């Protein structure tokens, strides 16, 4: 049966986008089968809930087409084995520490909410996520230093702190230091001012794990780079783990000294790309669950499609909607989202026109725009026409009469009928639903 599941996965891969498949279907593994009950393994509760809601029917259909049996599919969450959690080997460190080291406050200011479990992994960040987990479970072995780079608000800090939290969970005695490069610089300046540089150096160079955020802010600051260079060398030579983040690839950071740049390239460099729509939806769903916000699917799609790739801004929009719904005692809806967030995302919805939608739908179904706007009743033209009308209503501010005018002068009752027709079909026909959502994503991305 395991071979059948692998074949089913292969077939499912053909009908989903690569990002969707890699994020939601690829992590699923066969567990067992009994009569007509099939159990599959998923790595988390979140994936279980998302796959059950979005892709269960596709999975059942794919398996049924290979076996001619309609299985009852259940999902089992596979917890990480305690055996798999490698303990950080810090026993080789010196048993005798000097007094100044003993007195160092190892309060690392690691935000407990930033964990690997709370990080939503997708195709855009999969490599950085995997590298971070590898470092957290076996620091200073294969990937030292680890350099994570990507744009603002994509999750670099989340991964950086998650590494620290995981190491702390594995070994309570680990000396972990999490600093922004700006804080490192300010503390160094104060140490110089008050003649406490020995204490400053001792503090950082006796760490087991050094996590530095936004290293690009050291660029052009010679004294700070000089001090960090020697700190880096001391830790690296002592086989301590170093992780840094940046908004740019090392070679693209202006004002960064070549000797630091080359050291960052000694280890592993992992990038984080802007999330695709599927990943943004997953992030919104996870954050809404964590904040007890009921977020309808159409609103999640609207936010993910309209909003920036900056995950923090995306979360900000969600919190704004949640606060409004809570304070007014109302439920979050698509109309509410459009109204409350109009100052943020109005420009993106304005860019989409009925004409753009007509061309996109016509191209998708390989028909002419003139045929889409005509009164021809062939199914070849009717379904694309109704889909185009439905999407026009969803993605533009055009009224029913205005949409009718752009579809060959049809009256508003015909337009309303088309919208309701597609809404009903989307409830009952998964293929129609996927087609419509795919085209909406393409238009809004």
From Swiss-Prot:
Ranges where the record places region Domain I, interacts with DnaA modulators: 1-69
Source organism, top-level taxon: Bacteria
Ranges for region Domain III, AAA+ region: 109-325
Start and end residues of each stretch annotated as Domain IV, binds dsDNA: 326-445
Location of region: Domain II: 69-108
Pfam families: Bac_DnaA (PF00308), Bac_DnaA_C (PF08299), DnaA_N (PF11638)
Gene Ontology molecular function: any one: lipid binding
Coiled coil: none
Keyword list, A-Z: ATP-binding, Cytoplasm, DNA replication, DNA-binding, Lipid-binding, Nucleotide-binding
Nucleotide-binding keyword on record: yes
HAMAP family: DnaA_bact
Notes on the domains: Domain I is involved in oligomerization and binding regulators, domain II is flexibile and of varying length in different bacteria, domain III forms the AAA+ region, while domain IV binds dsDNA.
Similarity comment text for this entry: Belongs to the DnaA family.
Protein task: Plays an essential role in the initiation and regulation of chromosomal replication. ATP-DnaA binds to the origin of replication (oriC) to initiate formation of the DNA replication initiation complex once per cell cycle. Binds the DnaA box (a 9 base pair repeat at the origin) and separates the double-stranded (ds)DNA. Forms a right-handed helical filament on oriC DNA; dsDNA binds to the exterior of the filament while single-stranded (ss)DNA is stabiized in the filament's interior.
Subunit structure: Oligomerizes as a right-handed, spiral filament on DNA at oriC.
Descriptive protein name: Chromosomal replication initiator protein DnaA
């Amino acid at each position: 049966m395991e071979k059948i599941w692998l074949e089913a996965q292969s077939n499912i891969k053909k009908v989903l986008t690569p990002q969707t498949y890699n994020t939601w279907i690829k992590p699923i593994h066969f567990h067992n089968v009994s009569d007509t009950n099939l159990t599959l393994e998923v790595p988390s509760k979140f994936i279980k809930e998302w796959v059950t809601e979005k892709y269960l029917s596709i999975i059942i259909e794919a398996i049924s087409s290979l076996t001619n049996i309609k299985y009852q599919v259940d999902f089992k969450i596979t917890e990480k084995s305690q055996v798999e959690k490698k303990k950080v080997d810090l026993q080789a460190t010196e048993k005798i520490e000097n007094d100044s080291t003993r007195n160092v406050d190892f309060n690392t200011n690691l935000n407990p909410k930033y964990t690997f479990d709370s990080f939503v992994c997708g195709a855009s960040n999969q490599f950085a996520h995997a590298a971070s987990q590898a470092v957290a479970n076996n620091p200073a072995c294969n990937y030292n230093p680890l350099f994570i780079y990507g744009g603002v608000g994509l999750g670099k800090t989340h991964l950086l702190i998650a590494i620290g939290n995981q190491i702390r969970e594995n070994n309570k005695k680990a000396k972990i230091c999490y600093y922004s490069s700006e804080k490192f610089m300010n503390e160094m300046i104060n140490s110089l001012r008050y003649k406490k540089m020995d204490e400053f150096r001792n503090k950082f160079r006796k760490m087991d794990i050094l996590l530095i955020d936004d290293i690009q802010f050291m660029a052009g600051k010679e004294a700070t780079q000089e001090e960090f260079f020697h700190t880096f060398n001391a830790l690296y030579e002592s086989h301590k783990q170093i992780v840094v983040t940046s908004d740019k690839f090392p070679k693209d950071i202006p004002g960064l000294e070549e000797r630091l740049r080359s050291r960052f390239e000694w280890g592993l460099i992992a990038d984080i790309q802007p999330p695709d729509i599927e990943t943004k939806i997953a992030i919104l769903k996870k954050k809404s669950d964590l904040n007890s916000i009921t977020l309808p699917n159409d609103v999640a799609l609207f936010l993910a499609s309209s909003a920036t790739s900056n995950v923090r801004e995306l979360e900000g929009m969600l919190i704004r909607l949640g606060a409004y719904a809570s304070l007014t005692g109302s439920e979050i809806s698509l109309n509410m989202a459009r109204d409350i967030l109009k100052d943020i995302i109005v420009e993106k919805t304005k860019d989409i026109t009925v004409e753009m939608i007509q061309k996109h739908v016509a191209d998708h179904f390989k028909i002419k725009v003139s045929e889409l706007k005509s009164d021809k009743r062939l199914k070849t033209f009717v379904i694309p026409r109704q889909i185009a009308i439905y999407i026009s209503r969803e993605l533009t501010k055009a009224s029913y009469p205005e949409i009718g005018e752009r579809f060959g002068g049809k009256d508003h009752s015909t337009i309303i009928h088309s919208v309701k027709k597609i809404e009903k079909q989307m409830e009952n026909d998964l293929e129609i639903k996927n087609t419509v959502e795919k085209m909406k994503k393409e238009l809004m991305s």
